[in-house]
Swiss-Prot record:
Plays a role in the cellular response to DNA damage and the maintenance of genome stability through its association with the MRN damage-sensing complex. Promotes chromatin loading and activity of the MRN complex to facilitate subsequent ATM-mediated DNA damage response signaling and DNA repair. Residues 129-142, 177-194 have a biased composition (Polar residues). Keywords: DNA damage, DNA repair, Nucleus, Phosphoprotein. This is MRN complex-interacting protein. Belongs to the MRNIP family. One of its GO terms (molecular function) is chromatin binding. Residues 286-297 have a biased composition (Basic and acidic residues). Residues 75-102, 118-194, 273-335 are annotated as: Disordered. One of its GO terms (biological process) is positive regulation of protein kinase activity. GO terms for cellular component: Mre11 complex; nucleoplasm; nucleus.
Amino acid sequence: MAPAQQSRVLRCCSCHIFQAHQVKKSLKWTCKACGEKQSFVRAYGEGSGADCRRHVQKLNLLQGQVSELSLRSVEEAVNGSEEENAGPLQAEAGSQQAPSKPLESRWLKYLDKGCEDQELDRGRPALKTQLSTSAERPSSPAQPRKRKWNQRTGQPAHSLHGQGVDSVEDNFEHQDSTGLFGTEQQGTSPALSTANHTRELGFPRWKLPSPVTQVNAPSSKWARFLLAPGNSPQVDEKPSPLQEATMLADLAQGTVENKTPVEGHFSRAPAIRPPQAIHTTTPQLDRPDRKTREQPRDMGTPRADGRPLAQGTQKAPPLQLHNLFTTGEDFDDDL
């Protein structure tokens, strides 16, 4: 009879399960549970196949019991640590809750009921005063205790909310009217300013144009050849301070020459002639090609300022100052 084949008990390195395998020449074997290929390292038993299988069952049972014991020990250790950590916390919480009740009534033991009632009565008005002061504090910034006096006027300063809209408008209109009257009083002759006053003051005060700020500009030698305010398209505007200064300087130097009436035109009265309507001319007698002022003009043609003669008879416009520009000659710089 052939001898029975020998078997050996092996243990997988990955799943740690005991199993029986037949003895082979090669040292390589494969796990029956997880299929892991591995080499022979240690044999836990050798014998017949039946004996090796019974031995494998015993080893696996022992391994299962050991793993269960280890898991139980681990769980017990974790539960014990949690209980140990929770024990002092619960003890502290209980110690905090326990003395909280006697703290409220600890000092009340030594006090009489009458004293307690008196203390409660005293505390109520104090609370009322605190509430009243807290209610008054938000409104205190809006109502200061002391009024601030204005150092310039000597009157208490008012806030913008205290002033009415009507008072602000009246002040604004008063400033506009005073500025307008001040600039009108600084104007030229009363004969020319009366017509302008009547036209400008015909508008309501709140629609009047704001007074133009006068700039002290240096006088220029070409300012005398500029248009007069009467010849400009805006007849109601007053002459600029620059033109007034140049005209007054010409009057002071005595370089003014009276303009003779041209043939075919009406003559103006010298009494109502404004000072800004007078201009200076330089004598240039050596040039024969210059157009003289005595040349006759057509009666039906309009004037140089763009208005017909019929309107000129109704109202005398101021004298023209730009006649030098019609000569067609260059100006001399030594004026």
